[in-house]
Amino acid sequence: ARGAGLLSQDWSAVEDLLAQMSLPEADAQREAEVVSVATGGRLNLESVDPPNNIPLRERKAGCKNFYWKGFTSC
């Protein structure tokens, strides 16, 4: 019986998360503001570097062709 109670709590948490994900963007923005106020305005986000911060030559893993004037585009 106790395990079933935990499962229902887990499912309700999943349902809440899915409901938040299905909200339109305006409602999600409002929800984020409510959460921000509830947490005292503190938000811990990890900064993610954009994927294009590596030079083009280094992103192309298999490109090692060299012409006397410079690297060729593969």
Swiss-Prot record:
GO-annotated molecular function: hormone activity
Function per UniProt: Somatostatin inhibits the release of somatotropin.
Signal peptide (UniProt feature, chain positions): none
Record carries keyword Secreted: yes
Disulphide-bonded residues: C63-C74
Localization: Secreted
Source taxon at top rank: Eukaryota
Coiled coil stretches, renumbered: none
Recorded family membership: Belongs to the somatostatin family.
Predominant cellular place of this UniProt entry's protein: secreted
GO CC, any one term: extracellular space
Gene Ontology biological-process entries: regulation of cell migration
Propeptide: 1-46
Keywords assigned by UniProt, alphabetized: Cleavage on pair of basic residues, Disulfide bond, Hormone, Secreted
Protein name (Swiss-Prot/TrEMBL): Somatostatin-2
